[in-house]
């Protein structure tokens, strides 16, 4: 959901479309920035989620110095918070040089966390609680700890279990891995392994082409670690072929269709956006990247969670009297190819309008940061 240069966009969980009328304060995106996305235990293995977020916000404030004293709230999404210390958003705010007086909130809505942070920022501005808000998302899947449960009666600890799996990648209701929700979708909508591998191949090809043409340069903040500068998404695989994808074993179900190649990857990264009321931007003659026109949020059966964009997009189209043809580009998070294929099919989205620079399968999916990353790329 962001309108840029009179074009319309939809994203995975929240959607923003243009509509006319109304006296509600419009909200604009002044600036947006992200780190490169690192592989699991890759280039950002030794960098915490808080540090990644701080790196982005410091750069945003440096690029927009007049806004440093105007920020009135900080809202960041972060899923794997264990071990990060109290309120990562507050740490990011103070580490970035913002005033102690500015409140900060950390949001956990799993993969929707980064988008929810932006939605809450918009609400705060529209309610008159703030004129400028810093929002974003952070995640270090590499640094997510293992936890043991202590039994006082036996004075013993349980076998350590990864927080990443427990809190980030397992359905709390069924106790099953997120990958099995994709298998559910594939079975329910008859999505084949060949279809999923083909979708994954196209994602890799689009991301590789976008990277080669420099499409990500303006949105990526180069990050220096131990005198090495990282400025590209680490997980893009331009050498991917359909044949290679076909050799991969299924991960979650013996006779299933979901593999490591047609699912999103484990990643580290951060993204941030500076939002302001349109009247504030115009009063101070601040250029802006986009106008947020509308947001909606939906719930869905968690056993098929990945197809929620269908409901969200249909809801917004109906509410704003628009059709699919009226939308120029769609950005839908690629948690799993199976889910993305169903969304595209059910909404009849043309290939040339969908995730034109790749998505979670190719770029990576640092869960708490992905929502903001999508907005930043748009």
Regions found by a protein language model. Give the residues of each.
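Glycine- and Gly-Pro-enriched alpha-helical subdomains that act as flexible
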Residues: 278-326
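Short, well-ordered amphipathic alpha-helical segments that serve as non-catalytic structural scaffolds
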Residues: 49-65, 88-92, 117-120, 178-185, ...
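Active-site-proximal alpha-helical scaffold in enzymes
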Residues: 107-139, 186-215, 273-279, 344, ...
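Conserved beta-strand-centric core segments of catalytic alpha/beta enzyme folds
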Residues: 6, 16-56, 113, 117-155, ...
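Conserved catalytic cysteine-centered active-site region
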Residues: 78-131, 173-177, 239-265, 346-378
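Conserved beta-ketoacyl condensing-enzyme motif
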Residues: 45-112, 116-133, 138-157, 220-232, ...
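A glycine/threonine-rich phosphate-anchoring loop and its flanking beta-alpha core
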Residues: 159-194
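N-terminal extracellular/periplasmic Venus flytrap/periplasmic-binding protein-like
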Residues: 34-35, 46-55, 63, 195-283, ...
